[in-house]
């Protein structure tokens, strides 16, 4: 995935997955 949330509009489901992954790393 070369684009981020700023470059592409993600659906809520995808955003939730990204947030979950970020929380895990944090």
Swiss-Prot record:
Claim: DNA-binding is one of the keywords in the record:
yes
UniProt pathway annotation: Amino-acid degradation; L-proline degradation into L-glutamate; L-glutamate from L-proline: step 1/2; Amino-acid degradation; L-proline degradation into L-glutamate; L-glutamate from L-proline: step 2/2
Provide the GO MF annotations for this entry.
1-pyrroline-5-carboxylate dehydrogenase activity; DNA binding; proline dehydrogenase activity
Ranges for the region named Disordered are 1-26
**Function of this protein?**
Oxidizes proline to glutamate for use as a carbon and nitrogen source and also function as a transcriptional repressor of the put operon.
Keywords attached to this entry: DNA-binding, FAD, Flavoprotein, Multifunctional enzyme, NAD, Oxidoreductase, Proline metabolism, Repressor, Transcription, Transcription regulation
* Ranges of Basic and acidic residues composition bias in the record: 9-26
Induction and repression of expression: By proline, autorepression and catabolite repression, and is potentially nitrogen controlled.
Q: Tell me which EC number(s) this protein carries.
A: 1.5.5.2, 1.2.1.88
Instruction: Please give the organism.
Output: Klebsiella pneumoniae
- What's the protein here called? Bifunctional protein PutA
GO terms under biological process: proline catabolic process to glutamate
Catalytic activity, as annotated? L-proline + a quinone = (S)-1-pyrroline-5-carboxylate + a quinol + H(+); L-glutamate 5-semialdehyde + NAD(+) + H2O = L-glutamate + NADH + 2 H(+)
Q: Which cofactor does it need?
A: FAD
This protein's gene is called putA
């Amino acid at each position: 995935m070369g684009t981020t949330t700023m470059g592409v509009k993600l659906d809520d489901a995808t955003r939730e997955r990204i947030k979950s992954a970020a929380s895990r790393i944090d």
